[in-house]
C-alpha cells in the first residue's frame, strides 16, 4: 500500500454532496492541501471524453468516488433505467480512468442496498449475492455491486489498490430536508420542527421555514394561515399531532456523515487490498461495511427527535402505510478490526443536525 503525502493530489468526486463535502472537510482538517473537486457544471461524470480529459489534465494520485445518481423510493421505482445507467456510467468513467492513469489509491462509496432483501441480520459482507435484492432499488443496487466488483477485479488483475465501502443510512450537515423526497431522519426532523411552530401558533416561524425551503414551490408570504395549514397537513403536520407513515416498528441504523467521512479517509490511508482479500483462491467480498452496529425503532427515533425539537403534540402512526424492510443492521466487525469506530452517537447527532438546520442559511434541497 503506497502512502500519500500532505501535498498529494486527491480528487473527491461528489465533493458538494452530503458525504463528499464531509470528506473534503476531513481531508483539510488532516492537513491535505492539494484537493480537487468539480461541480456537475464543470465536469459531467457521464461524459467519458470529459472525464478522460480531466484525468489527463489533473493526474490525481488518489480518488474518492462519492458521486452517484441517488433518490428516494418512488424515484428508484419509476426511473429504473436512470439509476442503473447513470451509476454504471459514472463508475465506468471514473474508476476506469483512475486505472488508466495509474491512480495509486481509490475508495468507492456504495450502499448497503447491495445486500439481499432477506439477508441474515446483522448483515455481513459475505451476504452479498446470496439471494434476491429488494425489487424497488434493484437497478441502483446492481450498479453499486458492479462498482465494487470492478474495484475488486482491477485489484486482482492489475494490482491496483481500490477499496469499496458500504455505508449505512447517513445523516448530517447539508442533508436533504425536502418534504417531498427527503430520507427518514431529516424529513422527520423538519416535520417535527414545523409541527412545533404550528403548536405554538408561530406562523412567522412557519413562513420563515417555508421561505428557506419551499414545499411544492409555495410562496408562503402570499398564503393565508389556513392555506399553509392545509398544505402541511398533506404531509401529516398539524398543531396537535405529527402523523407518520407505518407502524414505527422497523429497526434502523444511522451514521453521522462526518463519521462516514472519517471512515472513508481512514480506509484510504490505512487499509490495503492485501489486508482484505484473504488466502482463498476465490477472492470476493472485499468491500467494507461502515456503520455503528447499533439500531433503534423508527418510533424510538421519532421520540428522540420530538424531545430534541421540543414538540409538545402527539405522534400518531398510520399503520396502513408501508413499513419497508423491518430490520437493516450492518455487521461492522471488519471496519472495527481495521482500526476505525464511530464517535457520534445518534442522540448527539440529532441535536447537532437540528442545530445545523436552525442556523443554516438555506438547508440543502438537492
Where in the sequence are the language-model features?
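Short-chain dehydrogenase/reductase
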Residues: 84, 88, 136-148, 178-186, ...
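Active-site Tyr-X1-5-Lys
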Residues: 135-168, 184-200
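C-terminal substrate-binding subdomain of Rossmann-fold SDR/epimerase-dehydratase oxidoreductases
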Residues: 3, 14-18, 22-30, 194-366
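NAD(P)H-binding glycine-rich loop region in Rossmannoid oxidoreductase-like domains
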Residues: 37, 48-88, 97-100, 117
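Active-site segment of SDR-like NAD(P)-dependent oxidoreductases
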Residues: 70-71, 112-120, 168-171
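Hydrophobic positions on the long internal alpha-helix
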Residues: 90, 94-98, 150-151, 263, ...
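SDR active-site strand-loop-helix element
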Residues: 13, 38, 63-67, 106-112, ...
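Conserved Rossmann-fold NAD(P)-dependent oxidoreductase catalytic core, especially the SDR/UDP-sugar
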Residues: 92-138, 163, 176
Amino acid at each position: 500500500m503506497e502512502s500519500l503525502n500532505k501535498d498529494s493530489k486527491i480528487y473527491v468526486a461528489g465533493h458538494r454532496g452530503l458525504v463528499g463535502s464531509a470528506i473534503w472537510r476531513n481531508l483539510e482538517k488532516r492537513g491535505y492541501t492539494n484537493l480537487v473537486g468539480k461541480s456537475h457544471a464543470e465536469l459531467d461524470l457521464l461524459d467519458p471524453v470529459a472525464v478522460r480529459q480531466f484525468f489527463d489534465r489533473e493526474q490525481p494520485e488518489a480518488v474518492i468516488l462519492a458521486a452517484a445518481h441517488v433518490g428516494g423510493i418512488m424515484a428508484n421505482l419509476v426511473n429504473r433505467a436512470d439509476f442503473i445507467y447513470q451509476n454504471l456510467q459514472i463508475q465506468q468513467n471514473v474508476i476506469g480512468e483512475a486505472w488508466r492513469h495509474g491512480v495509486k489509491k481509490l475508495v468507492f462509496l456504495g450502499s448497503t442496498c447491495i445486500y439481499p432483501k432477506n439477508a441474515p441480520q446483522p448483515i455481513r459482507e459475505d451476504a452479498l449475492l446470496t439471494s434476491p435484492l429488494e425489487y424497488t432499488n434493484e437497478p441502483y443496487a446492481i450498479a453499486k455491486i458492479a462498482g465494487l466488483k470492478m474495484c475488486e477485479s482491477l485489484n486482482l488483475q492489475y494490482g491496483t489498490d481500490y477499496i469499496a465501502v458500504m455505508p449505512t443510512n447517513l445523516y448530517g450537515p447539508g442533508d436533504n430536508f425536502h418534504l417531498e423526497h427527503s430520507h427518514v431522519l431529516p424529513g422527520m426532523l423538519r416535520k417535527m420542527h414545523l409541527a412545533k411552530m404550528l403548536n405554538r401558533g408561530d406562523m412567522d416561524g412557519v413562513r420563515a421555514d417555508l421561505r428557506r425551503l419551499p414545499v411544492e414551490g409555495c410562496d408562503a408570504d402570499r398564503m393565508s394561515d389556513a392555506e399553509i395549514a392545509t398544505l402541511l397537513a398533506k404531509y401529516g403536520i398539524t398543531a396537535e399531532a405529527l402523523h407518520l407513515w407505518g407502524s414505527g416498528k422497523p429497526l434502523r441504523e444511522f451514521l453521522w456523515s462526518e463519521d462516514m467521512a472519517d471512515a472513508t479517509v481512514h480506509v484510504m490511508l490505512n487499509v490495503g487490498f492485501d489486508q482484505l482479500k484473504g488466502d482463498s483462491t476465490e477472492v470476493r467480498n472485499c468491500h467494507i461495511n461502515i456503520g455503528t452496529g447499533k439500531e433503534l425503532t423508527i418510533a424510538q427515533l421519532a421520540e428522540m427527535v420530538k424531545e430534541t425539537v421540543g414538540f409538545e403534540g402527539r405522534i400518531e402512526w398510520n399503520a396502513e402505510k408501508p413499513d419497508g424492510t423491518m430490520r437493516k443492521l450492518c455487521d461492522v466487525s471488519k471496519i472495527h478490526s481495521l482500526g476505525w469506530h464511530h464517535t457520534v452517537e445518534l442522540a448527539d447527532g440529532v441535536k447537532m443536525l437540528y442545530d445545523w438546520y436552525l442556523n443554516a442559511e438555506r438547508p440543502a434541497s438537492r
